[in-house]
Amino acid sequence: MAIVRLTRDRIEGDPIMIVVRCLACVVASLTVSALGVTIDYTTIENPGNGSNTNGWGAVSSSYRLATDETPNAQYVEFLNRIDSAGINPNGIYNARMGSDALGGITFSLAAFSGAKYSVKAGTNPNTVPYGNAPVVFVTWFSAARFVNWLGNGQLASAASMEDGTYTLNNQTSGAIPPRNQGSGVQVALPSRDEWYKAAYYEPGSAHYLMLQGTNTITQTTVLYAANYGGDATPTLGPIAVGSYVNSTTPYGLRDMLGNVIEYTDTAGAIDFDVGRPQVFSGSWATPVAEIGFWNVNSPPIFRGATTATGEIGFRVAEVQAVPEPAVLPLCGVGAAIAVVVARRVRRGITSFPSLARRVLSFDL
Protein backbone atom coordinates (compact mmCIF):
# COMPACT_ATOMS: atom_id res chain seq x y z
CA MET A 1 0.00 0.00 0.00
CA ALA A 2 2.89 2.36 0.65
CA ILE A 3 4.08 1.92 -2.95
CA VAL A 4 0.58 2.56 -4.30
CA ARG A 5 0.29 5.80 -2.34
CA LEU A 6 3.71 6.92 -3.45
CA THR A 7 2.87 6.34 -7.10
CA ARG A 8 -0.46 8.11 -6.81
CA ASP A 9 0.97 11.08 -4.93
CA ARG A 10 3.91 11.56 -7.29
CA ILE A 11 2.25 10.69 -10.59
CA GLU A 12 2.70 14.28 -11.77
CA GLY A 13 6.33 14.28 -10.64
CA ASP A 14 9.53 12.76 -11.90
CA PRO A 15 8.75 9.17 -13.04
CA ILE A 16 12.37 8.13 -12.53
CA MET A 17 12.20 9.12 -8.87
CA ILE A 18 8.99 7.14 -8.51
CA VAL A 19 10.70 4.02 -9.84
CA VAL A 20 13.78 4.59 -7.68
CA ARG A 21 11.72 4.95 -4.51
CA CYS A 22 9.63 1.91 -5.30
CA LEU A 23 12.74 -0.17 -5.92
CA ALA A 24 14.23 1.11 -2.67
CA CYS A 25 11.20 -0.20 -0.79
CA VAL A 26 11.56 -3.61 -2.41
CA VAL A 27 15.31 -3.80 -1.74
CA ALA A 28 14.82 -2.74 1.88
CA SER A 29 12.26 -5.46 2.47
CA LEU A 30 14.47 -8.08 0.84
CA THR A 31 17.46 -6.95 2.91
CA VAL A 32 15.57 -7.29 6.18
CA SER A 33 14.41 -10.80 5.35
CA ALA A 34 17.75 -11.96 3.94
CA LEU A 35 19.99 -10.79 6.77
CA GLY A 36 19.98 -11.63 10.45
CA VAL A 37 21.05 -14.21 12.99
CA THR A 38 21.36 -17.84 11.93
CA ILE A 39 21.58 -20.45 14.68
CA ASP A 40 23.48 -23.70 14.16
CA TYR A 41 21.35 -26.06 16.23
CA THR A 42 22.15 -29.60 17.34
CA THR A 43 19.16 -31.89 17.84
CA ILE A 44 19.01 -33.56 21.24
CA GLU A 45 17.14 -36.82 20.75
CA ASN A 46 16.31 -39.72 23.10
CA PRO A 47 13.16 -38.19 24.62
CA GLY A 48 12.00 -39.68 27.88
CA ASN A 49 15.51 -40.41 29.14
CA GLY A 50 16.02 -40.94 32.85
CA SER A 51 17.64 -38.39 35.10
CA ASN A 52 21.06 -38.65 36.69
CA THR A 53 21.42 -39.57 40.36
CA ASN A 54 21.03 -35.89 41.27
CA GLY A 55 17.60 -35.77 39.61
CA TRP A 56 18.73 -33.65 36.66
CA GLY A 57 18.71 -34.33 32.93
CA ALA A 58 15.36 -36.02 32.21
CA VAL A 59 13.62 -34.40 29.21
CA SER A 60 10.34 -35.73 27.84
CA SER A 61 10.65 -34.54 24.22
CA SER A 62 13.33 -33.91 21.62
CA TYR A 63 14.66 -30.37 21.37
CA ARG A 64 17.46 -28.41 19.77
CA LEU A 65 20.30 -26.54 21.40
CA ALA A 66 22.78 -24.16 19.81
CA THR A 67 26.00 -26.01 19.06
CA ASP A 68 27.93 -23.02 20.35
CA GLU A 69 27.60 -20.06 22.66
CA THR A 70 26.13 -16.84 21.30
CA PRO A 71 28.92 -14.69 19.79
CA ASN A 72 29.38 -10.93 19.76
CA ALA A 73 28.62 -10.78 16.04
CA GLN A 74 25.12 -12.16 16.56
CA TYR A 75 24.41 -9.92 19.51
CA VAL A 76 25.38 -6.92 17.37
CA GLU A 77 22.73 -7.97 14.83
CA PHE A 78 20.18 -8.03 17.64
CA LEU A 79 21.19 -4.61 18.98
CA ASN A 80 21.08 -2.88 15.61
CA ARG A 81 17.75 -4.43 14.63
CA ILE A 82 16.08 -3.65 17.95
CA ASP A 83 17.71 -0.30 18.61
CA SER A 84 18.39 1.47 15.33
CA ALA A 85 18.30 4.88 17.06
CA GLY A 86 20.77 3.95 19.81
CA ILE A 87 18.56 4.62 22.85
CA ASN A 88 19.50 1.32 24.57
CA PRO A 89 16.04 0.14 25.70
CA ASN A 90 16.09 -1.75 28.99
CA GLY A 91 19.88 -1.78 29.06
CA ILE A 92 20.40 -4.44 26.40
CA TYR A 93 23.81 -2.89 25.75
CA ASN A 94 26.24 -2.81 28.67
CA ALA A 95 28.86 -0.06 28.46
CA ARG A 96 31.54 -2.55 29.55
CA MET A 97 31.04 -4.36 26.25
CA GLY A 98 32.90 -1.40 24.79
CA SER A 99 35.16 -0.25 27.62
CA ASP A 100 36.41 -3.58 28.98
CA ALA A 101 39.05 -5.55 27.10
CA LEU A 102 36.89 -8.68 27.36
CA GLY A 103 33.87 -6.94 25.83
CA GLY A 104 33.50 -7.13 22.07
CA ILE A 105 30.91 -4.53 21.04
CA THR A 106 31.21 -0.77 20.56
CA PHE A 107 28.52 1.91 20.42
CA SER A 108 28.53 5.17 18.46
CA LEU A 109 25.58 7.53 18.63
CA ALA A 110 26.98 9.35 15.59
CA ALA A 111 26.79 6.25 13.40
CA PHE A 112 24.02 5.78 10.85
CA SER A 113 20.62 4.56 12.02
CA GLY A 114 20.70 0.78 12.31
CA ALA A 115 24.49 0.76 12.65
CA LYS A 116 25.02 2.27 16.09
CA TYR A 117 26.56 -0.96 17.38
CA SER A 118 29.49 -2.80 15.85
CA VAL A 119 31.93 -5.59 16.63
CA LYS A 120 35.00 -4.14 18.30
CA ALA A 121 38.10 -3.98 16.12
CA GLY A 122 41.14 -6.03 17.04
CA THR A 123 41.38 -8.98 19.42
CA ASN A 124 40.64 -9.73 23.06
CA PRO A 125 43.38 -10.54 25.63
CA ASN A 126 43.39 -14.10 24.29
CA THR A 127 44.19 -12.77 20.78
CA VAL A 128 40.71 -13.76 19.59
CA PRO A 129 38.89 -11.58 17.02
CA TYR A 130 36.01 -10.06 18.96
CA GLY A 131 33.33 -11.13 16.52
CA ASN A 132 34.15 -14.79 17.12
CA ALA A 133 34.21 -14.58 20.92
CA PRO A 134 31.11 -15.29 23.05
CA VAL A 135 29.18 -12.20 24.06
CA VAL A 136 29.76 -11.30 27.71
CA PHE A 137 28.55 -8.58 30.09
CA VAL A 138 24.96 -9.66 29.47
CA THR A 139 22.33 -10.02 32.17
CA TRP A 140 19.82 -12.86 32.20
CA PHE A 141 17.17 -10.37 31.13
CA SER A 142 19.19 -9.27 28.09
CA ALA A 143 19.68 -12.92 27.10
CA ALA A 144 15.92 -13.51 27.48
CA ARG A 145 15.22 -10.49 25.27
CA PHE A 146 17.54 -11.91 22.63
CA VAL A 147 15.61 -15.20 22.50
CA ASN A 148 12.23 -13.43 22.53
CA TRP A 149 13.42 -11.41 19.53
CA LEU A 150 14.57 -14.55 17.73
CA GLY A 151 11.28 -16.30 18.39
CA ASN A 152 9.28 -13.33 17.14
CA GLY A 153 11.05 -13.31 13.78
CA GLN A 154 13.93 -10.87 14.43
CA LEU A 155 11.69 -7.83 14.01
CA ALA A 156 12.95 -4.25 14.03
CA SER A 157 10.79 -3.49 17.04
CA ALA A 158 11.72 -3.14 20.70
CA ALA A 159 8.31 -4.58 21.59
CA SER A 160 9.32 -7.89 20.00
CA MET A 161 11.82 -8.55 22.79
CA GLU A 162 9.42 -7.88 25.66
CA ASP A 163 7.04 -10.78 25.10
CA GLY A 164 7.19 -14.24 23.59
CA THR A 165 8.75 -17.15 25.43
CA TYR A 166 9.17 -14.84 28.43
CA THR A 167 6.83 -12.01 29.43
CA LEU A 168 9.22 -9.27 30.53
CA ASN A 169 7.20 -6.05 30.28
CA ASN A 170 10.33 -3.92 30.72
CA GLN A 171 11.53 -5.96 33.72
CA THR A 172 15.27 -5.64 34.25
CA SER A 173 15.71 -7.04 37.77
CA GLY A 174 14.10 -9.33 40.32
CA ALA A 175 13.03 -12.96 40.01
CA ILE A 176 13.27 -14.38 36.51
CA PRO A 177 9.89 -15.15 34.87
CA PRO A 178 8.93 -18.68 33.79
CA ARG A 179 8.45 -19.75 30.19
CA ASN A 180 5.02 -18.95 28.84
CA GLN A 181 2.79 -21.88 28.01
CA GLY A 182 1.56 -22.27 24.46
CA SER A 183 1.81 -24.55 21.46
CA GLY A 184 4.39 -25.31 18.81
CA VAL A 185 8.07 -24.48 19.13
CA GLN A 186 9.64 -21.81 21.33
CA VAL A 187 13.07 -20.21 21.18
CA ALA A 188 14.30 -20.11 24.76
CA LEU A 189 17.22 -20.23 27.10
CA PRO A 190 17.73 -23.90 27.97
CA SER A 191 16.30 -25.22 31.20
CA ARG A 192 18.52 -26.91 33.75
CA ASP A 193 17.53 -30.37 32.47
CA GLU A 194 17.89 -29.42 28.79
CA TRP A 195 21.36 -27.99 29.33
CA TYR A 196 22.45 -30.87 31.56
CA LYS A 197 21.26 -33.58 29.19
CA ALA A 198 22.92 -31.95 26.17
CA ALA A 199 26.20 -31.68 28.06
CA TYR A 200 26.47 -35.01 29.86
CA TYR A 201 23.98 -37.63 28.69
CA GLU A 202 25.26 -40.43 26.46
CA PRO A 203 22.56 -41.10 23.84
CA GLY A 204 20.96 -44.50 24.06
CA SER A 205 22.56 -45.41 27.37
CA ALA A 206 21.94 -45.02 31.08
CA HIS A 207 25.17 -43.08 31.58
CA TYR A 208 25.95 -39.44 32.21
CA LEU A 209 29.47 -38.50 31.14
CA MET A 210 32.03 -36.17 32.61
CA LEU A 211 33.45 -33.36 30.51
CA GLN A 212 37.15 -33.14 31.13
CA GLY A 213 39.72 -30.87 29.53
CA THR A 214 43.19 -29.47 29.51
CA ASN A 215 43.86 -25.85 30.30
CA THR A 216 46.45 -25.28 27.58
CA ILE A 217 44.87 -23.24 24.83
CA THR A 218 47.49 -24.22 22.27
CA GLN A 219 46.25 -27.82 22.35
CA THR A 220 43.19 -27.09 20.24
CA THR A 221 43.11 -30.36 18.31
CA VAL A 222 43.49 -32.85 21.14
CA LEU A 223 40.74 -34.72 22.93
CA TYR A 224 39.37 -33.48 26.24
CA ALA A 225 40.29 -29.82 25.71
CA ALA A 226 38.50 -26.91 27.37
CA ASN A 227 39.17 -23.27 28.16
CA TYR A 228 39.59 -22.67 31.89
CA GLY A 229 42.33 -21.88 34.36
CA GLY A 230 42.21 -18.10 34.61
CA ASP A 231 45.35 -16.01 34.98
CA ALA A 232 47.40 -19.02 36.10
CA THR A 233 47.60 -20.21 32.48
CA PRO A 234 47.59 -18.55 29.06
CA THR A 235 43.77 -18.56 29.15
CA LEU A 236 43.21 -14.85 29.69
CA GLY A 237 39.72 -14.63 28.23
CA PRO A 238 37.16 -16.40 26.03
CA ILE A 239 38.70 -18.25 23.10
CA ALA A 240 37.83 -18.33 19.42
CA VAL A 241 34.74 -20.18 18.31
CA GLY A 242 35.41 -23.70 17.10
CA SER A 243 38.90 -23.86 18.58
CA TYR A 244 38.58 -27.30 20.16
CA VAL A 245 37.54 -29.24 17.10
CA ASN A 246 37.93 -32.69 18.68
CA SER A 247 36.29 -31.95 22.01
CA THR A 248 32.51 -32.17 22.08
CA THR A 249 29.73 -33.48 24.25
CA PRO A 250 28.21 -36.86 23.31
CA TYR A 251 25.64 -34.98 21.20
CA GLY A 252 28.31 -32.88 19.49
CA LEU A 253 27.99 -29.55 21.30
CA ARG A 254 31.00 -27.41 22.14
CA ASP A 255 32.17 -25.31 25.09
CA MET A 256 29.94 -26.81 27.73
CA LEU A 257 32.92 -26.83 30.08
CA GLY A 258 34.78 -23.55 30.44
CA ASN A 259 34.93 -20.51 28.13
CA VAL A 260 31.88 -18.71 29.59
CA ILE A 261 29.37 -19.55 32.30
CA GLU A 262 25.94 -20.08 30.72
CA TYR A 263 22.50 -19.01 31.91
CA THR A 264 19.51 -21.35 32.06
CA ASP A 265 15.89 -20.38 32.68
CA THR A 266 15.55 -22.63 35.74
CA ALA A 267 15.13 -20.51 38.87
CA GLY A 268 16.31 -21.36 42.34
CA ALA A 269 13.62 -22.13 44.92
CA ILE A 270 15.46 -22.13 48.25
CA ASP A 271 16.65 -19.29 50.48
CA PHE A 272 18.96 -16.77 48.83
CA ASP A 273 18.68 -18.42 45.40
CA VAL A 274 14.91 -17.96 44.98
CA GLY A 275 14.26 -16.47 41.55
CA ARG A 276 17.93 -16.56 40.52
CA PRO A 277 18.89 -18.48 37.35
CA GLN A 278 20.87 -21.70 37.61
CA VAL A 279 24.10 -21.58 35.62
CA PHE A 280 26.50 -24.16 34.22
CA SER A 281 29.87 -24.67 32.54
CA GLY A 282 32.43 -22.64 34.45
CA SER A 283 34.49 -20.13 32.48
CA TRP A 284 37.89 -19.23 31.15
CA ALA A 285 38.61 -17.71 34.58
CA THR A 286 37.64 -20.76 36.66
CA PRO A 287 40.76 -21.95 38.53
CA VAL A 288 42.08 -25.39 37.71
CA ALA A 289 41.36 -26.56 41.26
CA GLU A 290 37.70 -25.52 40.95
CA ILE A 291 36.72 -26.72 37.48
CA GLY A 292 35.41 -29.99 38.96
CA PHE A 293 32.70 -28.04 40.76
CA TRP A 294 31.21 -27.21 37.34
CA ASN A 295 31.07 -30.76 36.00
CA VAL A 296 28.49 -33.54 35.87
CA ASN A 297 28.39 -34.14 39.61
CA SER A 298 28.54 -30.50 40.71
CA PRO A 299 26.08 -28.97 43.20
CA PRO A 300 23.56 -26.43 41.86
CA ILE A 301 25.11 -23.04 41.19
CA PHE A 302 23.08 -19.84 40.78
CA ARG A 303 23.87 -16.29 39.75
CA GLY A 304 21.94 -13.06 40.08
CA ALA A 305 19.81 -12.29 37.03
CA THR A 306 21.44 -8.88 36.77
CA THR A 307 24.97 -10.25 36.96
CA ALA A 308 26.94 -9.04 33.95
CA THR A 309 30.62 -9.95 33.95
CA GLY A 310 33.29 -10.97 31.49
CA GLU A 311 32.68 -14.60 32.42
CA ILE A 312 28.95 -15.03 31.72
CA GLY A 313 27.20 -15.61 28.39
CA PHE A 314 24.49 -17.89 27.02
CA ARG A 315 23.37 -20.23 24.26
CA VAL A 316 19.97 -20.58 22.61
CA ALA A 317 17.51 -23.49 22.67
CA GLU A 318 14.55 -24.40 20.49
CA VAL A 319 12.03 -26.39 22.51
CA GLN A 320 8.49 -27.72 22.42
CA ALA A 321 6.20 -25.32 24.26
CA VAL A 322 4.32 -26.58 27.30
CA PRO A 323 0.60 -26.62 26.36
CA GLU A 324 -1.76 -24.33 28.21
CA PRO A 325 -4.16 -26.12 30.59
CA ALA A 326 -7.14 -25.52 28.33
CA VAL A 327 -6.68 -24.44 24.72
CA LEU A 328 -9.84 -23.57 22.81
CA PRO A 329 -9.90 -24.92 19.24
CA LEU A 330 -9.06 -22.44 16.52
CA CYS A 331 -10.82 -22.29 13.20
CA GLY A 332 -10.66 -20.56 9.84
CA VAL A 333 -8.06 -17.83 9.45
CA GLY A 334 -7.04 -18.06 13.11
CA ALA A 335 -5.97 -21.67 12.69
CA ALA A 336 -4.03 -20.86 9.55
CA ILE A 337 -2.19 -18.06 11.33
CA ALA A 338 -1.38 -20.37 14.24
CA VAL A 339 0.17 -22.90 11.86
CA VAL A 340 2.27 -20.24 10.16
CA VAL A 341 3.50 -18.87 13.48
CA ALA A 342 4.36 -22.35 14.76
CA ARG A 343 6.38 -23.08 11.62
CA ARG A 344 8.37 -19.84 11.50
CA VAL A 345 11.99 -20.46 10.77
CA ARG A 346 14.15 -19.44 13.66
CA ARG A 347 17.74 -19.02 12.71
CA GLY A 348 21.00 -17.89 14.23
CA ILE A 349 24.83 -18.88 15.12
CA THR A 350 28.05 -19.94 13.46
CA SER A 351 30.94 -21.90 14.99
CA PHE A 352 32.70 -21.93 18.36
CA PRO A 353 35.06 -23.73 20.84
CA SER A 354 34.69 -27.23 22.26
CA LEU A 355 35.00 -29.85 25.04
CA ALA A 356 35.21 -33.58 25.77
CA ARG A 357 34.19 -36.37 28.06
CA ARG A 358 34.99 -39.50 30.02
CA VAL A 359 32.54 -42.14 31.27
CA LEU A 360 31.88 -42.21 35.00
CA SER A 361 29.88 -44.76 36.94
CA PHE A 362 26.66 -42.75 37.01
CA ASP A 363 24.40 -45.64 36.03
CA LEU A 364 20.66 -45.23 36.47
Model-derived segments and their meaning:
Residues 18-25, 327-330:
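Sec-dependent signal peptide recognition
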Residues 35-36, 246-249, 272-322:
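Disulfide-stabilized, aromatic/cysteine-rich ligand-recognition loop
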